């Protein structure tokens, strides 16, 4: 199919319309490697049944950032078993803003603790307020958080795949403000 489109057998389709066809530029390696916070729960201690997707209530979380100069971001949560997606537009990527968005989600969701048992996320600075993120607005702990290894996006693959699909509608450089 891809070769037919490249050979222009389908006049209305272009390479840009294909999900996997468009080439990507390689990122420059940063000089300083990013190290995960050693005091926070790693994905290595995450229970095996979460990785197997045998029960619902386990989510993956990430941010989609807009163009340079744009502060607004999209917070995406993907349920690992059902692939349900929650997308929230936030005014900025500060950790406090993320925490408030999770608080708002908890207040609006009936039976929150049954629907949100754990969240797997990356080591972005916006997700490193561990104590504040796990503290429920109703008291106690709202869910468990597990942090992926640095530069290991495949450890939360469902969310990364959904973010890639979202990027088809909001390509890099989109202003979310």
Task: Give, region by region, the residue ranges found by the protein language model.
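An active-site-proximal beta-strand-loop segment
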Residues: 48-85
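Active-site beta-loop-alpha junctions of metal-dependent nucleic acid enzymes
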Residues: 66-70, 87-111
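Short small-residue beta-strand/loop micro-motif enriched in glycine and branched aliphatics
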Residues: 83-88, 171-172
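Short, surface-exposed basic-aromatic patches at helix termini and helix-loop junctions that form
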Residues: 107, 132-143
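RNase H-like two-metal-ion nuclease catalytic core shared by retroviral integrases
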Residues: 121-123, 128-131, 145-170, 176-177
């Amino acid at each position: 199919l891809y070769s037919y489109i490249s050979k222009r057998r389908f006049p209305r389709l272009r390479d840009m319309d294909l999900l996997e066809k468009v080439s990507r530029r390689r990122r420059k390696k940063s000089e300083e490697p990013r190290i995960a916070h050693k005091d926070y729960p790693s994905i290595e201690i995450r229970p095996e049944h979460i990785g197997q997707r045998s029960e619902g209530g386990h989510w993956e979380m990430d941010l989609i950032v807009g163009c340079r100069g744009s502060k607004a971001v999209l917070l995406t949560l993907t349920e690992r078993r059902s692939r349900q997606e929650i997308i929230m537009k936030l005014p900025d990527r500060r950790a406090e803003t993320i925490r408030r968005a999770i608080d708002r989600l908890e207040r609006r969701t009936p039976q929150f603790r049954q629907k949100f048992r754990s969240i797997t996320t990356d080591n972005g600075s916006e997700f490193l307020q561990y104590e504040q993120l796990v503290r429920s607005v109703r008291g106690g702990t709202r869910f468990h958080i597990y942090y992926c290894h640095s530069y290991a996006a495949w450890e939360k693959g469902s969310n990364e795949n959904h973010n890639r699909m979202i990027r088809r509608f909001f390509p890099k450089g989109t202003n979310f403000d």
